[in-house]
Amino acid sequence: MNPIVAATSVVSAGLAVGLAAIGPGMGQGTAAGYAVEGIARQPEAEGKIRGALLLSFAFMESLTIYGLVVALALLFANPFAG
């Protein structure tokens, strides 16, 4: 494998995971903050809020997992290795 392709693949894999984690991380923090605020306002709605929060966390975390899959594909099944 060309050393430039190998080095670029490693850097790209790192960027894929790093950038894929920024958005969901910020979104999870915001969602958790609003969930705590909502539970503080209406304690009787805690179950519904928590259920919606966990479901939204799952959807947000899937974006990070997609970034990890792209990084693993670049590292171990590199389509550019030729």
Curated annotation (Swiss-Prot):
Phenotype when changing T8A: In strain: CC-503
N-formylmethionine modified-residue sites: M1
Main location per the UniProt record: plastid
Membrane topology: Multi-pass membrane protein
Gene3D superfamilies, sorted: F1F0 ATP synthase subunit C
Family designation: Belongs to the ATPase C chain family.
Protein name: ATP synthase subunit c, chloroplastic
